[in-house]
């Protein structure tokens, strides 16, 4: 039986002590009755109580599979990979589409993973693929239909489970997403029904969240999500995109801590998110920390990029919101989102993109003006010629997040995404910090 920490303060105190120290430093195929267990010791428990094995997880983006093929995955360093994304295509039958994710790549990927003893889940939804999720769980009939759709898909493709990537129940993500005040309650009913299915009872079942627990019927972060912990094998708070082009200034993509920042710069962090999810009833060992192997680019004038009279990069400098820097070749180009709204270039640099574009050296060390922020424990790099600043996690940031995972007894990590690293610099760093071998 899980008993949450008595207060957020308890976890924050432990975390502060940790941060102070850091500052100084071939499975078989299966039929409907029995899901495949690529790494049997970490198979879903059927009641959400599988906590015995550290989870080293990564997302595999199907739309990038031509650039990042299964044979390029460092299989021995992962226990799970989530194939992104399966998208419900309508508000009636909730059929899944992988049209945007190279559907033909899924089965070969699953085969390759299982040959290496690694489990594969399908990530359902995503930021641009959650338009119909509210409908899919809105009533008993829809939930039953959606459960059947998902179970049939899992069986057909020999998957080990599902990752529900609905980041904003009862909270507007894309402007055309369906929302309902009862989204979070309905999501729980759906997950409970999925667990009652003979296949669903045995699969890995996880869900993503943000820096606060899912939104309740009153529009506030839920105070009690302990029932989710009974049906899910793990919850992954996505601790990235905390700052970006929507923010008032440049800021850390994934702050480890922000209690040392000015109050108006405290937008949430790894430390605060873990404390809030735990206080709301998710056991620490069921929290798998979502980390990002990429950074956000901002247009920052040279007169604002440095501390006055120095070559030290400034903290939280203003940026030009009218200029949207292009990222690397995996960046989302300017276009139209699923709602028909025009969108600019995404300004995203993968870790290898930072090397390819000259922000970092081949070994991940700084090549351009650089700052490691002692508060957020994240990195910044600046291209003076193009006047672009990028906030991101470097190897030190990943190592410290790994150490935090270990110190707090979390369930593991989940990196977005497996193909964004360079020569496993980040993957090795977080594994090292968590006490795992390279």
Curated annotation (Swiss-Prot):
Coiled coil: none annotated. The keyword Lipid metabolism does not apply. GO terms for molecular function: chitin binding; PAMP receptor decoy activity. One of its GO terms (cellular component) is extracellular region. Residues 1-23 form the signal peptide. It holds the Pfam family Glyco_hydro_18. Chitin binds at residue 416. Induction: Expressed during the biotrophic interaction with cacao. Its main location: secreted. InterPro entries: Chitinase_II/V-like_cat, Chitinase_insertion_sf, Glyco_hydro18_cat, Glycoside_hydrolase_SF, Glycosyl_Hydrlase_18. Catalytically impaired chitinase that binds efficiently to chitin, but not to chitosan, xylan, or cellulose. Despite the lack of chitinolytic activity, retains substrate binding specificity and acts as an effector to prevent chitin-triggered immunity by sequestering immunogenic chitin fragments. Does not function in the protection of fungal cell wall against plant hydrolytic enzymes. Belongs to the glycosyl hydrolase 18 family. This is chitinase-like effector. The gene is Chi.
